[in-house]
Curated annotation (Swiss-Prot):
Name of the encoding gene: psbD
Protein name (record): Photosystem II D2 protein
Binding site for chlorophyll a ChlzD2: H118
Modified residues (N-acetylthreonine): T2
Protein residues bound to pheophytin a: Q130, N143
Length: 353
């Protein structure tokens, strides 16, 4: 039996190899295969947002002014969600709603679905970009894993939550004041601040901020002095290969402060990764629960006692009354097509207000 040994030769003009060589070439701005998703989607998402906040009204969907052209500023302009009557339509420009009419498409809220979907794929493309670059330079993929947390929050809030409700209308509009209103909506209709997943998210974000502040200050405090410059930046050579701070000194300091301290840098930095990422993941999971209208903590015994005893009140019962007020105002304003009329006896009342 004869075995022929030889080098397998591919066609030098293979289209995939040509594209791979060009996309992954070392240049000032890396493109990569992920860039085929990232750059177009980011361009269209940002372009749609700037177009909407500059020119497009929300009169036909929310009865609001939402563009610079109508007198809004950076904090009050927004790309608003489609009307509730349009449910979960993708609102394609060539779809049955707009029928290819760009002006009508903007009036119906088509820019919101355009920005939301391109924004989601743009964020995913950015995560893939980090993964692709990490593979290219033989790094571990923890940057991409960390970036999955804000992606999870974006997808859960802007896509999964409204999919669980009656339409895109109940997603946040893309604007600063619009996001604030959405937060108030979440509180009034879902009692979000008393949701354990929100609590884990807050603990993760604020805990991460605390860890960053402590870590940065500790590193600055324990820097090795290897120059006589006036400050940190002048006293050190930015290309030095040696260790720049003393982990041993930092460990001794925090051992005395707290009684415990991180013993090595790997565990320390993994913890700084774990806290915010887990917090954001948990928060995203909580929003998925809200899409299904799962409730937060209910302390019914306190509500019953507060209803029976005008002298009994807790911060919880006060907040419940505030939530009722938010619902009474927002439901009538946000859903005028429902013709919601609240009689006096169902409006918030009691010794809390």
């Amino acid at each position: 039996m004869t075995i022929a040994l030889g080098k397998f030769t591919k066609d030098e003009n293979d289209l995939f190899d040509i594209m791979d060589d060009w996309l992954r070439r070392d240049r000032f701005v890396f493109v990569g295969w992920s860039g085929l998703l990232l750059f177009p989607c980011a361009y269209f998402a940002l372009g749609g947002w700037f177009t909407g906040t500059t020119f497009v009204t929300s009169w036909y969907t929310h009865g609001l002014a939402s563009s610079y052209l109508e007198g809004c500023n950076f904090l009050t302009a927004a790309v608003s969600t489609p009307a509730n009557s349009l449910a979960h339509s993708l609102l394609l420009l060539w779809g049955p709603e707009a029928q290819g009419d760009f002006t009508r498409w903007c009036q119906l809220g088509g820019l919101w679905t355009f920005v939301a979907l391109h924004g989601a794929f743009g964020l995913i493309g950015f995560m893939l970009r980090q993964f692709e670059l990490a593979r290219s330079v033989q790094l571990r993929p923890y940057n991409a894993i960390a970036f999955s947390a804000p992606i999870a929050v974006f997808v859960s809030v802007f896509l999964i939550y409204p999919l669980g409700q009656s339409g895109w209308f109940f997603a946040p509009s893309f604007g600063v004041a619009a996001i604030f209103r959405f937060i108030l909506f979440f509180q009034g209709f879902h009692n979000w601040t008393l949701n354990p997943f929100h609590m884990m998210g807050v603990a993760g974000v604020l805990g991460a901020a605390l860890l960053c502040a402590i870590h940065g200050a500790t590193v600055e405090n324990t820097l090795f002095e290897d120059g006589d410059g006036a400050n940190t930046f002048r006293a050190f050579n930015p290309t030095q290969a040696e260790e720049t701070y003393s982990m041993v000194t930092a460990n001794r300091f925090w051992s005395q402060i707290f009684g415990v301290a991180f013993s090595n840098k790997r565990w320390l930095h993994f913890f700084m990764l774990f806290v915010p990422v887990t917090g954001l993941w948990m928060s995203a999971l909580g929003v998925v629960g809200l899409a299904l209208n799962l409730r937060a903590y209910d302390f019914v015994s306190q509500e019953i006692r507060a209803a029976e005893d005008p002298e009994f009140e807790t911060f919880y019962t006060k907040n419940i009354l505030l939530n009722e007020g938010i619902r009474a105002w927002m439901a009538a304003q946000d859903q005028p097509h429902e013709n919601l009329i609240f009689p006096e006896e169902v409006l918030p009342r009691g010794n809390a207000l």
